[in-house]
Design a protein with these regions (language model features):
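The feature captures the beta-strand-to-loop junction immediately N-terminal to the Walker
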Residues: 32-37
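Conserved beta-strand
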Residues: 7-10, 17-27, 58
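ABC-family P-loop ATPase nucleotide-binding domains
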Residues: 77, 81-139
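Catalytic Walker B motif of ABC-type/P-loop ATPase nucleotide-binding domains
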Residues: 152-156, 161
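Helix-to-loop junction immediately C-terminal to a conserved catalytic motif
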Residues: 50
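ABC transporter nucleotide-binding domain
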Residues: 170-254
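A short, proline-enriched helix->beta-strand linker immediately N-terminal to the Walker B motif
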Residues: 146-150
Length: 284
Protein backbone atom coordinates (compact mmCIF):
# COMPACT_ATOMS: atom_id res chain seq x y z
CA UNK A 1 0.00 0.00 0.00
CA UNK A 2 1.28 3.49 -0.86
CA UNK A 3 1.87 5.99 1.93
CA UNK A 4 0.42 9.46 2.24
CA UNK A 5 2.87 10.44 4.98
CA UNK A 6 6.14 8.93 6.20
CA UNK A 7 7.88 10.49 9.21
CA UNK A 8 11.12 9.04 10.51
CA UNK A 9 12.70 10.29 13.76
CA UNK A 10 11.55 13.88 13.20
CA UNK A 11 12.73 16.50 15.68
CA UNK A 12 12.40 20.25 16.17
CA UNK A 13 13.66 22.39 19.05
CA UNK A 14 12.43 25.70 20.44
CA UNK A 15 13.39 27.44 23.70
CA UNK A 16 11.48 25.51 26.36
CA UNK A 17 10.03 22.90 23.99
CA UNK A 18 11.29 20.01 21.88
CA UNK A 19 9.56 17.71 19.43
CA UNK A 20 11.58 14.50 19.61
CA UNK A 21 11.85 11.33 17.54
CA UNK A 22 8.41 11.33 15.88
CA UNK A 23 7.99 8.39 13.49
CA UNK A 24 4.89 7.00 11.78
CA UNK A 25 3.54 6.02 8.36
CA UNK A 26 0.01 6.91 7.28
CA UNK A 27 -1.32 4.63 4.53
CA UNK A 28 -2.98 6.25 1.55
CA UNK A 29 -6.76 6.47 1.75
CA UNK A 30 -6.83 6.75 5.57
CA UNK A 31 -7.67 9.43 8.14
CA UNK A 32 -5.25 10.10 11.00
CA UNK A 33 -6.38 11.86 14.15
CA UNK A 34 -3.63 13.78 15.95
CA UNK A 35 -4.42 14.35 19.63
CA UNK A 36 -2.58 15.88 22.56
CA UNK A 37 -2.81 18.60 25.17
CA UNK A 38 -2.18 22.27 24.37
CA UNK A 39 1.52 22.67 23.71
CA UNK A 40 2.06 18.98 22.93
CA UNK A 41 3.47 19.80 19.48
CA UNK A 42 0.51 19.15 17.16
CA UNK A 43 0.67 22.47 15.29
CA UNK A 44 4.48 22.27 15.17
CA UNK A 45 4.25 18.84 13.53
CA UNK A 46 1.75 20.06 10.94
CA UNK A 47 4.00 23.03 10.07
CA UNK A 48 6.92 20.63 9.58
CA UNK A 49 4.84 18.42 7.28
CA UNK A 50 3.77 21.50 5.29
CA UNK A 51 7.39 22.58 4.95
CA UNK A 52 6.51 25.87 6.68
CA UNK A 53 9.06 25.15 9.41
CA UNK A 54 12.43 23.42 9.03
CA UNK A 55 13.01 20.26 11.02
CA UNK A 56 16.33 19.69 12.78
CA UNK A 57 16.44 15.93 12.47
CA UNK A 58 14.83 13.00 10.70
CA UNK A 59 12.95 12.88 7.41
CA UNK A 60 9.43 13.61 6.14
CA UNK A 61 7.92 12.29 2.93
CA UNK A 62 4.58 13.66 1.72
CA UNK A 63 2.83 11.70 -1.04
CA UNK A 64 6.13 9.94 -1.69
CA UNK A 65 8.29 13.06 -1.93
CA UNK A 66 10.80 14.50 0.53
CA UNK A 67 9.59 17.76 2.06
CA UNK A 68 12.86 19.56 1.31
CA UNK A 69 13.26 18.21 -2.24
CA UNK A 70 13.25 20.51 -5.26
CA UNK A 71 9.84 19.36 -6.47
CA UNK A 72 8.02 19.74 -3.14
CA UNK A 73 6.82 23.26 -3.95
CA UNK A 74 4.92 21.86 -6.95
CA UNK A 75 3.60 18.97 -4.84
CA UNK A 76 1.92 21.47 -2.50
CA UNK A 77 -0.68 21.88 -5.25
CA UNK A 78 -1.92 18.45 -4.13
CA UNK A 79 -2.09 19.33 -0.43
CA UNK A 80 -5.09 21.13 1.06
CA UNK A 81 -4.48 22.99 4.33
CA UNK A 82 -6.99 24.32 6.87
CA UNK A 83 -5.54 26.01 9.95
CA UNK A 84 -7.17 26.95 13.25
CA UNK A 85 -7.42 30.55 12.05
CA UNK A 86 -8.40 30.96 8.40
CA UNK A 87 -6.60 34.00 6.98
CA UNK A 88 -8.36 35.48 3.96
CA UNK A 89 -8.29 39.24 3.24
CA UNK A 90 -11.01 40.73 5.44
CA UNK A 91 -12.41 42.99 2.72
CA UNK A 92 -12.83 40.31 0.05
CA UNK A 93 -15.95 38.26 -0.58
CA UNK A 94 -16.01 34.51 -1.22
CA UNK A 95 -16.62 35.25 -4.90
CA UNK A 96 -13.59 37.57 -5.05
CA UNK A 97 -11.49 34.98 -3.21
CA UNK A 98 -12.34 32.47 -5.93
CA UNK A 99 -10.55 34.67 -8.47
CA UNK A 100 -7.47 34.82 -6.23
CA UNK A 101 -7.46 31.06 -5.66
CA UNK A 102 -7.97 30.37 -9.35
CA UNK A 103 -4.61 32.01 -10.03
CA UNK A 104 -2.93 30.10 -7.19
CA UNK A 105 -3.81 26.48 -7.98
CA UNK A 106 -3.22 24.89 -11.38
CA UNK A 107 -5.95 22.30 -10.73
CA UNK A 108 -8.49 24.81 -9.43
CA UNK A 109 -12.13 23.71 -9.85
CA UNK A 110 -14.49 26.71 -9.63
CA UNK A 111 -17.58 24.52 -9.94
CA UNK A 112 -16.56 22.46 -6.90
CA UNK A 113 -15.83 25.64 -4.91
CA UNK A 114 -19.23 27.21 -5.64
CA UNK A 115 -20.96 23.89 -4.95
CA UNK A 116 -19.39 23.93 -1.48
CA UNK A 117 -20.46 27.55 -0.94
CA UNK A 118 -24.01 26.45 -1.70
CA UNK A 119 -23.78 23.30 0.44
CA UNK A 120 -22.36 25.27 3.39
CA UNK A 121 -24.88 28.11 2.84
CA UNK A 122 -22.08 30.67 2.54
CA UNK A 123 -23.06 34.00 0.95
CA UNK A 124 -20.73 34.57 -2.05
CA UNK A 125 -20.93 38.37 -1.89
CA UNK A 126 -20.54 38.99 1.84
CA UNK A 127 -17.14 40.35 3.03
CA UNK A 128 -15.00 37.89 4.95
CA UNK A 129 -14.86 40.32 7.89
CA UNK A 130 -18.57 39.66 8.48
CA UNK A 131 -18.19 35.86 8.58
CA UNK A 132 -18.64 34.00 11.87
CA UNK A 133 -15.97 31.53 13.00
CA UNK A 134 -17.99 28.64 11.60
CA UNK A 135 -18.41 30.40 8.25
CA UNK A 136 -14.68 31.16 8.11
CA UNK A 137 -13.78 27.52 8.70
CA UNK A 138 -16.28 26.38 6.06
CA UNK A 139 -14.78 28.78 3.51
CA UNK A 140 -11.29 27.49 4.29
CA UNK A 141 -12.50 23.92 3.84
CA UNK A 142 -14.25 24.80 0.56
CA UNK A 143 -10.98 26.25 -0.75
CA UNK A 144 -8.91 23.26 0.43
CA UNK A 145 -11.26 20.81 -1.31
CA UNK A 146 -11.47 22.65 -4.64
CA UNK A 147 -8.03 22.02 -6.17
CA UNK A 148 -7.91 18.21 -6.44
CA UNK A 149 -5.89 17.73 -3.25
CA UNK A 150 -4.75 14.21 -2.41
CA UNK A 151 -3.87 15.08 1.19
CA UNK A 152 -5.65 17.34 3.68
CA UNK A 153 -3.78 18.81 6.67
CA UNK A 154 -6.31 20.12 9.18
CA UNK A 155 -5.35 21.94 12.39
CA UNK A 156 -8.33 22.17 14.77
CA UNK A 157 -10.88 22.65 11.95
CA UNK A 158 -13.87 22.02 14.23
CA UNK A 159 -12.68 23.88 17.35
CA UNK A 160 -15.24 26.30 18.77
CA UNK A 161 -18.02 25.15 16.43
CA UNK A 162 -21.43 23.93 17.53
CA UNK A 163 -22.13 20.16 17.27
CA UNK A 164 -24.35 20.41 14.18
CA UNK A 165 -21.72 22.34 12.21
CA UNK A 166 -19.01 19.94 13.41
CA UNK A 167 -20.98 16.91 12.20
CA UNK A 168 -21.54 18.58 8.83
CA UNK A 169 -17.81 19.24 8.41
CA UNK A 170 -16.81 15.74 9.57
CA UNK A 171 -19.12 14.25 6.95
CA UNK A 172 -17.32 16.26 4.25
CA UNK A 173 -13.94 14.87 5.38
CA UNK A 174 -15.34 11.34 5.41
CA UNK A 175 -16.65 11.79 1.86
CA UNK A 176 -13.24 13.06 0.76
CA UNK A 177 -11.51 9.75 1.60
CA UNK A 178 -14.03 7.57 -0.20
CA UNK A 179 -11.58 8.02 -3.05
CA UNK A 180 -8.78 5.74 -1.79
CA UNK A 181 -6.07 7.95 -3.29
CA UNK A 182 -6.94 10.66 -0.74
CA UNK A 183 -5.83 10.95 2.88
CA UNK A 184 -6.38 13.26 5.86
CA UNK A 185 -4.40 14.33 8.92
CA UNK A 186 -6.63 16.15 11.41
CA UNK A 187 -5.62 17.53 14.81
CA UNK A 188 -8.35 18.19 17.34
CA UNK A 189 -9.06 18.56 21.05
CA UNK A 190 -12.50 17.06 20.43
CA UNK A 191 -11.70 13.37 20.80
CA UNK A 192 -15.29 12.30 20.13
CA UNK A 193 -14.98 13.78 16.62
CA UNK A 194 -11.84 11.77 15.95
CA UNK A 195 -13.41 8.59 17.32
CA UNK A 196 -16.19 8.91 14.73
CA UNK A 197 -13.95 9.83 11.81
CA UNK A 198 -10.46 8.38 12.03
CA UNK A 199 -8.77 5.14 11.02
CA UNK A 200 -5.58 5.85 12.98
CA UNK A 201 -4.81 7.82 16.15
CA UNK A 202 -1.48 9.47 17.01
CA UNK A 203 -1.04 10.83 20.52
CA UNK A 204 1.56 13.53 21.24
CA UNK A 205 2.51 14.34 24.83
CA UNK A 206 5.11 17.01 25.61
CA UNK A 207 6.70 16.66 22.20
CA UNK A 208 6.89 12.85 22.22
CA UNK A 209 4.74 10.45 20.22
CA UNK A 210 3.30 8.09 22.84
CA UNK A 211 1.51 5.96 20.29
CA UNK A 212 0.45 5.69 16.66
CA UNK A 213 -2.18 2.96 16.35
CA UNK A 214 -5.06 1.81 14.26
CA UNK A 215 -8.06 3.13 16.19
CA UNK A 216 -9.99 -0.15 16.42
CA UNK A 217 -6.89 -2.17 17.34
CA UNK A 218 -6.04 0.38 20.05
CA UNK A 219 -9.49 0.11 21.62
CA UNK A 220 -9.39 -3.69 21.43
CA UNK A 221 -5.95 -3.98 23.04
CA UNK A 222 -6.84 -1.68 25.96
CA UNK A 223 -9.67 -1.78 28.46
CA UNK A 224 -10.94 -0.35 31.72
CA UNK A 225 -10.82 -2.00 35.14
CA UNK A 226 -13.21 -0.40 37.64
CA UNK A 227 -12.31 -1.65 41.10
CA UNK A 228 -11.48 -0.92 44.70
CA UNK A 229 -8.16 0.58 45.66
CA UNK A 230 -6.67 -2.70 46.89
CA UNK A 231 -7.56 -4.54 43.67
CA UNK A 232 -6.25 -1.68 41.55
CA UNK A 233 -2.93 -1.61 43.37
CA UNK A 234 -2.65 -5.40 42.95
CA UNK A 235 -2.86 -5.24 39.14
CA UNK A 236 0.41 -6.15 37.35
CA UNK A 237 2.43 -2.96 36.98
CA UNK A 238 3.19 -3.65 33.33
CA UNK A 239 -0.51 -3.94 32.56
CA UNK A 240 -1.53 -0.54 33.93
CA UNK A 241 -1.19 2.47 31.62
CA UNK A 242 -2.90 5.03 33.84
CA UNK A 243 -5.30 5.29 36.78
CA UNK A 244 -7.79 7.68 38.28
CA UNK A 245 -8.52 7.33 41.98
CA UNK A 246 -11.83 8.59 43.38
CA UNK A 247 -13.71 8.33 46.67
CA UNK A 248 -15.31 5.03 45.62
CA UNK A 249 -12.34 3.28 44.05
CA UNK A 250 -10.16 3.31 40.94
CA UNK A 251 -10.55 3.39 37.17
CA UNK A 252 -7.50 1.82 35.56
CA UNK A 253 -6.56 1.79 31.89
CA UNK A 254 -4.94 -1.58 31.20
CA UNK A 255 -3.45 -3.70 28.45
CA UNK A 256 -5.95 -6.54 28.16
CA UNK A 257 -3.32 -9.16 27.31
CA UNK A 258 -1.44 -8.55 30.58
CA UNK A 259 -4.38 -8.62 33.00
CA UNK A 260 -5.23 -11.86 34.89
CA UNK A 261 -8.20 -13.68 33.38
CA UNK A 262 -10.28 -13.43 36.55
CA UNK A 263 -10.24 -9.60 36.39
CA UNK A 264 -13.22 -8.04 34.61
CA UNK A 265 -12.10 -5.65 31.86
CA UNK A 266 -14.65 -3.26 30.35
CA UNK A 267 -14.49 -1.58 26.92
CA UNK A 268 -12.98 1.91 27.01
CA UNK A 269 -13.84 4.89 24.82
CA UNK A 270 -11.11 6.82 23.09
CA UNK A 271 -11.59 9.96 25.20
CA UNK A 272 -11.25 8.16 28.54
CA UNK A 273 -8.36 6.11 27.17
CA UNK A 274 -6.43 9.28 26.37
CA UNK A 275 -7.31 11.02 29.65
CA UNK A 276 -6.09 8.05 31.70
CA UNK A 277 -2.99 7.72 29.56
CA UNK A 278 -2.10 11.37 30.25
CA UNK A 279 -2.58 10.77 33.99
CA UNK A 280 -0.26 7.79 33.76
CA UNK A 281 2.41 9.82 31.98
CA UNK A 282 2.20 12.61 34.56
CA UNK A 283 2.74 10.10 37.38
CA UNK A 284 5.85 8.58 35.79
Amino acid sequence: MNSALELNDVSKHYPGFSLEGVSFTLPQGCILGLVGENGAGKSTLIRLIMGASKREGGSIRVLGQEVDSEGFCDLKQEVGVVLDETHFPEGLTARQMERVLRGTYSNWQPGVYFDFLSRFELPPDKPFRDFSRGMRMKLGIAAALSHEARLLLLDEPTGGLDPMVRDEILEVFSEFTRDESRSVLISSHIVSDLEKLCDYIAFLHKGRLLFFEEKDALKESCGLVVCGRAQGEALPKGAVLGCETGPYGMRCLVRRALVPRDVEVEPVGLEELILLLVKGEKER
